[in-house]
Every structure is written in C-alpha cells, then in structure tokens.
C-alpha cells in the first residue's frame, strides 16, 4: 500500500480500539507509526512490540517527524496540542475514517455496519474468507481469538472492515459489499433523530457500486423500512422474517449454537458457532450471505463459521471452574445488547443463576435509556450497577444523572434484587461472595459495559483461579 510520499504516521489516541487497529494495519503495511495516549496498557505495549513509537501524554514535539496526523472522533482537535502543532507546521491532519477510506482504495471492500453486531460479524466474515483461502486484509474494532488480534494484512483482493456509524465515520468508506446488520436509535449526540441516522445508513449503503451488493437484516424493522430507499442490489437475511438467507433448527447448549441455513432454495445443515444467542445466529447469517455473494463454496462457509472462536469481550468466558461457575465479560452497552446478552446466557445455561454486573456508558446514554436498561436487566436473577463510565463526557454537564437511575429502573421493571454500588472495592467484595456461594444449579457472573468494567471481570476471574472458587 502507498499513500503518496507519506512514510510516517502519528496517531492521536492510539490506544483506542479503532485507532490501535489502524495503527497495526499501517505497521504491517510498512509505514512508520508513532502515537500518543493518556495511558498505556496491553494494546499500546503490543503496538510498541510491532515497532510503533508510543508516547504517554500529548506534546507538540511528538508530531515533528511525521507526514500526517490521524485522530479519532473521541479527540477534540481544538483541545489537543499535537493537532494544533501539526496544523501550525502545515502537516496534514485527518480523521481515522478518512485514512481508512484511503487504504481501502487498494482492495475490494466488505464493510459491516449496524448499531449492534458489527465486530462479531466482521470477524466471522474474516474467518470464513481466511479458511476459504482468500487471504483478506482485515480490520476489526476488537480482538479476535482466531486472528489473535484486530488486524490482518493479506495478499488477497478483499478488505474486511468494521464500519462505525459514530460521527458519520462510515460515510468515508468505499464498500463493494455493505452489510446492514441492525439499526435503532444510538449516537443521538451525532444524529439528533432516528430519521437522520436512517438517512446516514441509506447514504452508506448507496456508496456500493452498481455491481456490488447490500446485505440487509430483515429482522430489524428500521432496516426493512429503508430497503426501498436503496438503489443497489440487496440480499436479505434473518430468522423471524422472510429472507433470502435464514436459519432453522437452532439449538443452544454449553456455549455453542448449531443451526441449519436455508439460502435461495438450498439447505445447508450442521452450521455450528462457538458463541451462544440468536443474535449471533443473525451475525452468522450475515457472514454466510456475504460469502455466497462472493461466490464461495457453501461447504467452505459452513467450515469457516465453525472455525470462528469468538471475540474478546463478546460473551468471553474469563473463568470456568468446571463446577458451574462462569465469569463472562461482554461489551454490551446498549439496552438491546444487554437484553440479547442476558437472553443468550439464559438460553445457553437455563438452570444457572445469572448475576448481571452492569456499568452504564456515558451520562447522555444513561439519561436517554435508563428505563430501557431497567427492562433489559430485570431478566437477571441479581443485578449490580456500578458508577457510570464517562468516556468523552463530563459529569458536571449532566446534573442529576447517575447510575442510580438504572438501578431504580430495574426495580420499576420488576427486578427484585438490584444494588447500585459506586465503590469498586466493595463491588469486587460482593462479587467474590457471589462466586463463593455458587451452588449446584450454577452461577454466571455476567459483566457488561463498554468501559473499564472489563478490568473488574479480569480481577474476579483471577481471584477465582487463585482461590479455586
């Protein structure tokens, strides 16, 4: 890959999921990469091991040797000294999605969009293509067990990308195949209304060339509603609604899901994926439909889905004591994702006591969806709510908004056992008590959220292993 005379790229916020993935892609493509972030960790250490120069904190001098500066939507350009220094020095400054769009020029793009399921579906497509011998280039906003990372630089013609709708980023991409996995109200700080969000999805899908294809989930009403606005060829997939590609005979047991695919009059039995939940069957159908559109052998698609081994923080089992105690970490942070994750746990382990540990993400999202979170979480046997993870927001901008709103909504929705625990040490103590008290019916400690609740899941898992809970 070449980007004119560009040899060295500096990335502001390099430790984020999306930014670290593009950093890894650039490194593997032969570019020099430097980057800055406010904290270090496993991700930045891995990038450093691959040759990136990592800076802790932001300083103007750190951009002096670069040819371009890339930043994410989470970074405010007007508040960042590195971006200001680059602009003053005449160094080009671009958003991540613009850089990604440029890199896509060299490949045939398969872009997976949707409010939910983007990461998993992208990884499933990538796994299938690799197993089919296609050697794709891949970039996912998460860590794939199969890929052992978030990026792959392949020699084949396909580039598989997770397409993020936040800040309208996906409108800079150039897909040949666009997957619309799901669609409902989200990122209202960007879009303002659901109608505006739907228009953005239509614009994204219509970026597909006349010879391409849009793969649409028929189970989502909002996606069904926009199909008529697409001026491109469409393939539909789904479970509950009539579709070109559908699933029957769905069976969930011990964390795996098996089913039969029916596609365009043909039947493909024996599909098995290493993750629970009907939502993951939908994700697999999206991947299968994509493979069919590429003309791949259906037998290889079935095999490829069987090789999919999950994603970090997507119903990731962190600890299994073999006696019924599971510690599970999941990225679910939207009410629909929380609902689907809890349903997957209930269907996969019907007799287990489900203890939900939820960290609300963003004050704005908590304010908007407190009631919906309550209904979703009320399905658990016990619910613990931690403090809100603010991410890019400031608490003082949202007076009166706290995680207690979610706890109250759980009670209002019929949840009988819920605790809002703001102190992380106390929360850990209570969860270890839950683990120690796990009985013969089994207990699932299900951690959910897009913030640092994942660290708590890891701590509890480590304690479980150390103390043989």
UniProtKB/Swiss-Prot annotation:
Primary location: cytoplasm
Catalytic reactions of this protein: UDP-N-acetyl-alpha-D-muramate + L-alanine + ATP = UDP-N-acetyl-alpha-D-muramoyl-L-alanine + ADP + phosphate + H(+)
Sequence positions that bind ATP: 114-120
The protein's annotated pathway: Cell wall biogenesis; peptidoglycan biosynthesis
Stored InterPro entries: Mur-like_cat_sf, Mur_ligase_C, Mur_ligase_C_dom_sf, Mur_ligase_cen, Mur_ligase_N, MurCDEF_pg_biosynth, UDP-N-AcMur_Ala_ligase_MurC
EC top class, as a word: ligase
GO molecular function, one term: UDP-N-acetylmuramate-L-alanine ligase activity
GO cellular component: cytoplasm
Keywords: ATP-binding, Cell cycle, Cell division, Cell shape, Cell wall biogenesis/degradation, Cytoplasm, Ligase, Nucleotide-binding, Peptidoglycan synthesis
Any single GO BP term: cell wall organization
Cysteines paired by S-S bonds: none
Keyword Cell membrane: no
EC number(s) reported in the record: 6.3.2.8
Localisation per UniProt entry: Cytoplasm
Described function: Cell wall formation.
Family that this chain belongs to: Belongs to the MurCDEF family.
Record's protein name: UDP-N-acetylmuramate--L-alanine ligase
UniProt source species: Chlorobium phaeovibrioides (strain DSM 265 / 1930) (Prosthecochloris vibrioformis (strain DSM 265))
């Amino acid at each position: 890959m070449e980007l004119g005379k560009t040899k060295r790229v500096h990335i502001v916020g390099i430790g984020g999921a999306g930014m670290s993935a593009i950093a890894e892609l650039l490194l593997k493509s032969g570019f020099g990469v430097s980057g800055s972030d406010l904290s270090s960790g496993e991700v930045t250490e891995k990038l450093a091991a691959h040759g990136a120069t990592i800076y802790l904190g932001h300083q103007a001098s750190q951009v002096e040797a670069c040819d371009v500066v890339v930043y994410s939507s989470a970074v405010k350009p007007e508040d960042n000294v590195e971006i200001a220094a680059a602009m003053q020095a005449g160094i080009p400054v671009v958003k991540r999605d613009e850089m990604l769009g440029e890199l896509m020029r060299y490949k045939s793009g398969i872009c997976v969009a949707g409010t939910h399921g983007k990461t998993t579906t992208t990884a499933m497509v990538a796994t299938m293509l690799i197993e089919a011998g296609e050697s794709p280039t891949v970039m996912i906003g998460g860590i794939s067990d199969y890929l052992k990372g978030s990026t792959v630089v392949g020699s084949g013609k396909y580039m598989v990308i997770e397409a993020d709708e936040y800040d309208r980023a996906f409108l800079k991409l150039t897909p040949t195949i666009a997957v619309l996995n799901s669609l409902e109200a989200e990122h209202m700080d960007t879009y303002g209304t659901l109608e505006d969000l739907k228009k953005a999805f239509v614009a994204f899908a219509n970026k597909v060339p006349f010879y391409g294809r849009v793969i649409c989930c028929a189970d989502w009403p909002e996606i069904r509603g926009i199909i008529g606005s697409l001026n491109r060829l469409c393939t539909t997939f789904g479970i509950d609604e009539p579709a070109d590609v559908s699933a029957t005979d769905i069976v969930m047991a011990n964390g795996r899901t098996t089913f039969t695919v029916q596609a365009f009059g043909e039947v493909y039995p024996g599909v098995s994926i290493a993750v629970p939940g009907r939502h993951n069957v939908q994700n697999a159908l999206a991947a299968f439909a994509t493979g069919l559109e590429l003309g791949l052998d259906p037998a290889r698609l079935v095999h490829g889905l069987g090789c999919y081994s999950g994603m970090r923080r997507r119903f990731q089992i962190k600890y299994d004591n073999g006696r019924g105690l599971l510690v599970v970490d999941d990225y679910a942070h939207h009410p629909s994702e929380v609902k689907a994750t809890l349903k997957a746990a209930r269907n996969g382990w019907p007799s287990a006591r489900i203890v939900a540990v939820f960290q609300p993400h963003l004050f704005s999202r908590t304010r908007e969806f407190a009631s919906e979170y309550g209904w979703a979480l009320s399905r658990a046997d016990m619910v613990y709510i931690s403090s809100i993870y603010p991410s890019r927001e400031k608490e003082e901008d949202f007076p009166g908004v706290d995680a207690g709103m979610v706890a109250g909504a759980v009670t209002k929705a019929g949840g009988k056992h819920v605790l809002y625990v703001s102190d992380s040490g106390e929360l850990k103590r209570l969860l270890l008590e839950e683990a120690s008290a796990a009985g013969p019916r089994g207990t699932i400690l299900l951690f959910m959220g897009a913030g640092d609740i994942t660290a708590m899941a890891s701590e509890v898992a480590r304690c479980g292993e150390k103390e043989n809970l």
